[in-house]
Amino acid sequence: MVIVRCKPTSPGRRHVVKVICPNLYKGRPIASLLQKKVKTGGRNNYGRITTRHIGGGHKKLYRCIDFKRRYDNVPAVVQRIEYDPNRSSNIILILYKNGKRSYILEPKGIKVGDIIESGNLVPIKLGNALPIKKIPIGTILHNIEIKSGKGGQIARSAGSYAQLISKENKYVVIRLRSGELRKIHIECRATIGEVGNSEHMLRILGKAGASRRYGIRPTVRGTAMNPVDHPHGGGEGRNFGKHPVSPWGLKTKGKKTRRNKRTERFIVRHRNK
């Protein structure tokens, strides 16, 4: 990774910090592993905004990532490391011995030419995917399944990982980077290692136009709006004189937002405790 701080030749370049990966493949992705991605602009089928601050952005094609690691006990060689516009981490193209190709998340430290594998009896090696019951305590993991066979859902963004803490009967306990301790079934799979491109957090876009290219629209403060648009709006000056609330009048800043009580029993310790 190379971190480049741009010279202040203009106000838009003054604060820009780029994270450059010199080993990224510069050609086109594999066409058979691409899908069309339709933008919604944060709207639902009625045309109403369901997610704010989304809209515009550069056109993207979705890279089909193999979160399940479908081909067991078939060695695969890492062909190249590629950029993926749909996620913060990079991806790698792997070629299986049976001739199949797949995209998977890039484990930190993987190199072109490395051999990786998935299955129940594969060794504990960077990039290998296997059931958590076969992995020793203290191992760093990523792309962890919540439900066996569904594919990895935990620790998939750039630089993220989880650590295996303990094993208890049919469940293991992992510690996430947020500090949360969570139970995972022993049959669920995980990949050895940490997700690559951990320097992604150091980048600074530097100007509003760069955010718009990523499809991020401006975030306007409630106190800067009119009373018709937000409970904090209107008045003389900037003081809104009440407890902070959302645009719909619900309390914010500290209010619990988790609703899925069914899976609450799998959380041993919450991240904020």
Curated annotation (Swiss-Prot):
GO molecular function annotations of the record:
rRNA binding; structural constituent of ribosome; transferase activity
Q: Which GO terms describe its biological process?
A: cytoplasmic translation
InterPro entries, alphabetized: NA-bd_OB-fold, Rib_uL2_dom2, Ribosomal_uL2, Ribosomal_uL2_bac/org-type, Ribosomal_uL2_C, Ribosomal_uL2_CS, Ribosomal_uL2_dom3, Ribosomal_uL2_RNA-bd_dom
Q: Which domain of life is it from?
A: Bacteria
Q: Where is this region: Disordered?
A: 221-263
Q: Where is the composition biased (Basic residues)?
A: 252-263
Q: Which UniProt keywords apply?
A: Ribonucleoprotein, Ribosomal protein, RNA-binding, rRNA-binding
Cellular component terms per the entry's GO annotation: large ribosomal subunit
Q: Does the keyword section mention Ribosomal protein?
A: yes
Q: Which Pfam families match?
A: Ribosomal_L2, Ribosomal_L2_C
Query: Whom does it interact with, and what assembly results?
Result: Part of the 50S ribosomal subunit. Forms a bridge to the 30S subunit in the 70S ribosome.
Q: Which purpose does this protein serve, as stated in its record? A: One of the primary rRNA binding proteins. Required for association of the 30S and 50S subunits to form the 70S ribosome, for tRNA binding and peptide bond formation. It has been suggested to have peptidyltransferase activity; this is somewhat controversial. Makes several contacts with the 16S rRNA in the 70S ribosome.
Q: Which NCBIfam families match?
A: rplB_bact
> Which protein is depicted?
Large ribosomal subunit protein uL2
Organism, by scientific name, is Buchnera aphidicola subsp. Cinara cedri (strain Cc)
